Amino acid sequence: EATLRMLYEVQRQAIPELTRVFGHTGLYLRPCEALAPALSGNMLAQVLSLYREGGRLRGELACEDEALPVASGTVSLAYALCVLETSPRPEALLGELARVLKPGGVALLITLNPWGLARLRWSFRGLDAVDPAVLGQWLAGRGLDIERQRWLGPMWAPPRGTDLQETPAGGLLAGLRAGHLVVARRREAGLTPLRAGKPALSLRPGMSAG
């Protein structure tokens, strides 16, 4: 199916981000059972893989979106592939992903691009795309700082038999790709974003602060 091939291509382009995350445990949420449960490219010892079925998540465990059966602060990577769009409570699901992350842990979130050409394939299915600006607000409110974000995936999922590879497109055209990737890191305990203030005093040899 064209949609599945599009999702695999989006995942393929996100692999470089996976290789930057190390640790013991990861959590992988995918939009359907048809997608492979293995998270290709990850550098973790083990990954709990769940998929969307109706309004719940199933797989190695079964749960509601707002009650992931994972202890707080135990996951090095939370990888969510197009599951916010199908969630009955996307903001609550994001809150759960933030909860299970260790301080310094990484959330890798891939959402459908609400302005991409490929939206014509899924908009009629009742999926509600998450605006990247809104997603950024949700992350900030849950102690996650965005490190990188970009558009990725193909412009359009072509018919079966067509080679689906990334086409060179940047600038304004990049915003027409199928997906949007956000890499966010959970703030270390006790750290808050710095506010702009007076420049720090620079001491020269022989000077003291007092």
Predicted regions and their residues:
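Class I SAM-dependent methyltransferase SAM/SAH-binding core
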Residues: R12-L68
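A short acidic, Gly/Pro-enriched loop at the edge of an enzyme's catalytic core
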Residues: E66-A78
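A short SAM/SAH-binding and catalytic strip from SAM-dependent methyltransferases
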Residues: S76-R89
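A short glycine-rich, Lys/Arg-flanked "PGG" loop and its adjoining helix->strand segment in the class I
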Residues: E91-V106
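Conserved class I S-adenosyl-L-methionine
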Residues: V106-V134
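Short alpha-helix
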Residues: G126-G153
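C-terminal lobe and adjacent flexible extensions of AdoMet/dcAdoMet transferase-like proteins
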Residues: R142, T167-G210
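Conserved catalytic loop of SAM-dependent methyltransferase domains
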Residues: E147-G179
